[in-house]
């Protein structure tokens, strides 16, 4: 995985009306490895490292929703996982951040 570009928007932008951090990534070989393929061990280790992820609602809009997304069917993509890790690291640092979006740039 490589970070291709990063930008910080301190005010309203075409991404949001509030400050955001934008990363453009190349997942490389990891693009073919959703969480379902990585297995529950990956998910469990991630939650152990960042327990606050257990509170992320994700698209289910309820605590545990993100964990549910990682475990259901084929799971979710690692770009989406990185989105939640970035949000949680900001929360651990004392910022009340909840907004994130992941998009594929095929």
PLM region spans:
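M16/MPP (pitrilysin/insulinase) zinc-metallopeptidase core fold and M16-derived inactive scaffolds
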Residues: 39-106
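Charge-rich, well-structured scaffold segments of protease-associated domains
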Residues: 1-26, 88-106
